[in-house]
């Protein structure tokens, strides 16, 4: 039951009607028996600055940030973590000492399954990342954190690829990072130990699409991990095609859950978060198996 003492958490975005964050966060809060509630706050870009001030006024203790505010919110925060600085985006904000502090838990979300269920020594391995947008930044940083020897980012727009590479120039990540146009993929696919789709190709409702064809994946090594950040459909065409070539597949649902777990640890100041409850709440909500 929500009372005047209930602590407020939430997600800001535009739109947020379809956000899955309230489903998993409220499931975790209920399981833990805590007096918190997690609410969706639809905030248009023009209202962002006023909204951030209002959230402080009404006593919100923390919130998630989704599209289109992940970059725009940065100048409105008192402090951002080195991780958020490196990625250039914030997805988690906490109230600390009457100030808003931002970080990014997408890296933790991305690498969690690669450090647990699918753990291996990544130090001599090669990562190939499809796409060079915002999601690719968290994946690049995550691959660097895991210790990948080579990180290859593949995109279609030469200018954007160069901008992407240039944005890491002052980071140690630059030594491991290479960017390529799409036509270079034929050389990269046979070398890939991890192949990640960060593009929206294959996302609902375009469920029959894939960033790579079966022909392009034919030289994928057996045992390579194919990882798609998309979680609807589950699995995507990309993952199905990769699995047919002997790949181990990971879908985006796990990243969604794990970035949420990392955010809750920050807000609740505790490490014991019911991951399974969050995962099952999403699977049930989405009507998945």
Curated annotation (Swiss-Prot):
GO terms for molecular function: NADP binding; shikimate 3-dehydrogenase (NADP+) activity. The active site is at residue 70. Its EC number is 1.1.1.25. It is an enzyme of class 1 (oxidoreductase). NADP(+) binds at residues 131-135, 229, 252. One of its GO terms (biological process) is chorismate biosynthetic process. Shikimate binds at residues 19-21, 66, 91, 106, 231. It catalyses: shikimate + NADP(+) = 3-dehydroshikimate + NADPH + H(+). Keywords: Amino-acid biosynthesis, Aromatic amino acid biosynthesis, NADP, Oxidoreductase. One of its GO terms (cellular component) is cytosol. InterPro entries: Aminoacid_DH-like_N_sf (IPR046346), NAD(P)-bd_dom_sf (IPR036291), SDH_C (IPR041121), Shikimate_DH (IPR011342), Shikimate_DH-bd_N (IPR013708), Shikimate_DH_fam (IPR022893). Pathway: Metabolic intermediate biosynthesis; chorismate biosynthesis; chorismate from D-erythrose 4-phosphate and phosphoenolpyruvate: step 4/7. Gene3D superfamilies: Leucine Dehydrogenase, chain A, domain 1, NAD(P)-binding Rossmann-like Domain. PANTHER family: BIFUNCTIONAL 3-DEHYDROQUINATE DEHYDRATASE_SHIKIMATE DEHYDROGENASE, CHLOROPLASTIC (PTHR21089:SF1), SHIKIMATE DEHYDROGENASE (PTHR21089). HAMAP family: Shikimate_DH_AroE (MF_00222). Involved in the biosynthesis of the chorismate, which leads to the biosynthesis of aromatic amino acids. Catalyzes the reversible NADPH linked reduction of 3-dehydroshikimate (DHSA) to yield shikimate (SA). Homodimer. Belongs to the shikimate dehydrogenase family. This is Shikimate dehydrogenase (NADP(+)). It comes from Nostoc sp. (strain PCC 7120 / SAG 25.82 / UTEX 2576). The gene is aroE.
